[in-house]
From Swiss-Prot:
Location relative to the cell: Cytoplasm
Signal peptide: none
Protein name as it appears in the record: Type III pantothenate kinase
Protein family according to the UniProt entry: Belongs to the type III pantothenate kinase family.
SUPFAM superfamilies, sorted: Actin-like ATPase domain
PANTHER family, per database record: TYPE III PANTOTHENATE KINASE (PTHR34265:SF1)
Pathway given in the UniProt record: Cofactor biosynthesis; coenzyme A biosynthesis; CoA from (R)-pantothenate: step 1/5
Coiled coil: none
Reactions catalysed: (R)-pantothenate + ATP = (R)-4'-phosphopantothenate + ADP + H(+)
Gene name of this polypeptide: coaX
Keywords recorded for this protein, A-Z: ATP-binding, Coenzyme A biosynthesis, Cytoplasm, Kinase, Metal-binding, Nucleotide-binding, Potassium, Transferase
Catalytic machinery residues: 102 (proton acceptor)
EC number per UniProt: 2.7.1.33
InterPro entries according to UniProt: ATPase_NBD, Type_III_PanK
């Protein structure tokens, strides 16, 4: 990640690059990307009320593509006249009305980058598992509380338990814990890994050899834990799937790779 202000120093005059901004409004944070053509060049995350230094210098000067799972936050950014994506904009089949636009974009980005059929695991505030077949048809999926949400909920709702933070979780915990914080980490992490292993193995039976990719804020640590916990599962990690999905819409659903 560059330390300069997002969007600084990137060429605007090359017609092939055509810069644009992507904004994914998630359940707890704003996810930004500075894109040139169909490639995310810089990505960063802010809270819902970002400081001016965190905003891209090109905001309002180049096209802004926006997707959101928080309607009231969408209204904040209408002043920049964004192209607001909905499920109707995506070339995917069998989506139900309440299906999350973030899941759909990640699925599209996964399929066009790694090939359909594909399974995408998004490790965010909510952890989602979503599968599409070779015809870009939604097979189905699941939603569970993410790692951070589980840790926070145990600390908030149970007086005898400490509230633990994700930054304390730096390595795969011991399964058989001998203190309360370690027991919480063990239960949360191995519970999530067990669920993921079950879904991924079932997906392999349904679609042998199909792509399986992890993304999201907790995606990198989940990917590392899963490799250690279930080394026989072939799962990629890609932090840009949602923005690759946006790029596909921006460029008319052309293959990314």
């Amino acid at each position: 990640m560059e330390t300069s202000k997002p969007g600084c120093g990137l060429a605007l005059d090359n017609d092939k690059q055509k810069p644009w901004l992507g904004l994914m409004i998630g359940n707890s944070r704003l996810h930004w990307a500075y894109c040139s053509g169909n490639a995310p060049l810089q990505t960063w995350v802010t809270d819902y009320n970002p400081k001016s230094a965190q905003l891209p210098v090109l905001l309002g000067k180049v096209p802004l593509m926006l997707a959101s799972v928080v309607p009231e936050q969408t209204e904040v950014w209408r002043v920049y006249q964004p192209k607001i994506l909905t499920l109707k904009n995506l070339p995917l089949v069998n989506l139900y009305p309440s299906f999350g636009i973030d899941r759909a974009l990640a699925g599209l980005g996964t399929g066009l980058t790694y090939g359909f059929p594909c399974l995408v695991v998004d490790g965010g505030t909510a952890l989602t598992i979503t599968g599409f077949d070779q015809d870009k048809k939604l097979v189905g999926g699941a939603i569970l509380p993410g790692l951070g949400l589980q840790l926070a909920t145990l600390g908030d709702r149970l007086a005898a338990l400490p509230k633990l933070e994700m930054d304390q979780l730096t390595e795969l915990p011991d399964r058989w814990a001998l203190d309360t914080p370690s027991a919480i980490f063990s239960g949360v992490v191995y519970g999530v890994l067990g669920a993921l292993q079950s879904y991924l193995q079932d997906w392999q039976k349904l679609f042998p050899g199909a792509a399986m990719v992890i993304t999201g804020g907790d995606g990198k640590i989940l990917h590392g834990f899963l490799k250690e916990h279930s080394p026989n599962l072939s799962v990629a990690w890609d932090d840009n799937l949602i923005f690759l999905g946006m790029a596909a819409i921006h460029h008319g659903d052309r293959p990314i790779c």
